A protein has these predicted regions:
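Conserved beta-strand elements of the Class I
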Residues: 75-77, 288
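Short beta-strand-to-loop junctions in surface cap/lid or active-site-entrance loops
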Residues: 66-73
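A residue-level signal for conserved active-site and pocket-lining positions in enzyme catalytic cores
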Residues: 61, 172, 290
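C-terminal accessory segments enriched in acidic
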Residues: 1-5, 10-34, 39-42, 46-51, ...
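N-terminal cap/lid segment of alpha/beta-hydrolase-fold proteins
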Residues: 54-59
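Glycine-rich N-terminal segment of FAD-binding domains in flavoprotein oxidoreductases
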Residues: 80
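Active-site/substrate-binding loop(s) of hydrolase catalytic cores
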Residues: 73, 87-88, 93-246, 253, ...
Length: 321
């Protein structure tokens, strides 16, 4: 428990939390809403350079958090956990946020780069978990879907451990308005006609509060570029149609060279409908999908340290490019 003293007296809670933070076991807890809340609260208390706001709510009323640090000009947007089983991406982003905050506050180097100097001129915004309902369902089962629990139970045939969609059975990364009609036709051809654990794109683009919230935010706020983190495959997707900026290829090459990940093109049922696709198509600015790690979703917590080490330099470059 953290005890806070009266105004004007020593803030003993910070001392306790600093001792805790030095030894945070990023792989030693359940990565659900409660665990994520504990990490975010700790980060914001320890690091005054990190500000937090609730960007909006999911279908089930769970908070979708936004973390900001650095100068407010020309920010980069980093988003994770679009899919229920891909919660490791949210932990990766929180861990990198802690690194960025330390770099800004203490001058610490990240991959031998003084990222703090850059953050004093430009900013970063992080949405660790775009799909909090999906994450909760994949970890705790259909009961976590609230009023949608019967839908989830039926669509998952009683086993929601491989749930990727939101609580309404809509795959958020098929719900953005970029090639949505063509993707919807492909879904129909594959027999995907209704809410499902994955790959059902909804009745129309931005039908879901989570995808609509993210689009509204990007329409209201200028971002230099955006990165959407998924798992798995160790791949970087960087283009979408005629509006892909010329510099996107070079940026992807830099990220690939620094991480060892390969530049790829998506398969048919992963073409269009995604956040990266919409960002490029609608805003005409660079956006990337980063498929972290390798294996079978959900990737284990024990993979996080190696994934973070592999991607650290790439993450730094993604912020400063």
């Amino acid at each position: 428990m953290v005890f806070l003293s009266r105004p004007g007296h020593t803030f003993y809670g910070v001392i306790i939390l600093k001792a805790y933070h030095r030894n945070i076991n990023w792989t030693g807890f359940v990565p659900d809403a409660q665990g994520r809340e504990r990490l975010i609260s700790t980060l914001c208390l320890l690091h005054p350079s990190v500000s937090r706001q609730v960007l909006g709510k999911s279908l089930c009323g769970r908070s979708i958090d936004l973390l900001q640090l650095g100068a407010g000009d020309d920010p980069v947007l980093l988003c994770g956990a679009f899919h229920g089983m891909e919660w490791l991406t949210s932990l990766l982003l929180l861990r990198f946020t802690a690194q960025m905050a330390a770099a800004l506050e203490t001058g610490a180097l990240i991959s031998e780069i003084k990222l703090g100097d850059f953050l004093r001129r430009r900013g970063v915004m992080v949405i660790p978990c775009v799909n909090p309902d999906g994450v909760e369902i994949s970890i705790h089962g259909s009961a976590a879907a609230g009023e949608c629990r019967e839908l989830v139970h039926n669509a998952s045939r009683g086993d929601a451990s491989r749930w990727q969609a939101n609580a309404r059975g809509v795959d958020l990364n098929h719900n953005f308005n970029a090639g949505w009609e063509a993707l919807h036709a492909l879904e129909q051809q594959q027999g995907i006609h209704c809410p499902a654990p994955t790959r059902y794109g909804g009745e129309y683009p931005e039908s879901e509060p989570e995808s609509r919230l993210l689009c509204d935010f990007c329409r209201s706020q200028y971002f230099r570029h955006a990165l959407a983190f998924h798992s798995q495959g160790e791949e970087i997707y960087w283009d979408f149609g005629e509006h892909t900026p010329e510099k996107s290829r070079l940026m992807a090459q830099v990220m690939a060279a620094s991480s060892g990940y390969k530049m790829s093109e998506p398969e048919a049922l992963a073409t269009g409908g995604g956040f990266k696709d919409w960002f490029i198509s609608y805003l005409h600015r660079p956006a990337f999908t980063i498929e972290i790690g390798k294996g079978k979703n959900p990737l284990p917590l024990s993979d996080l340290p190696n994934i973070h080490q592999t991607l650290e330099e790439m993450l730094v470059f993604s912020v400063i490019m």
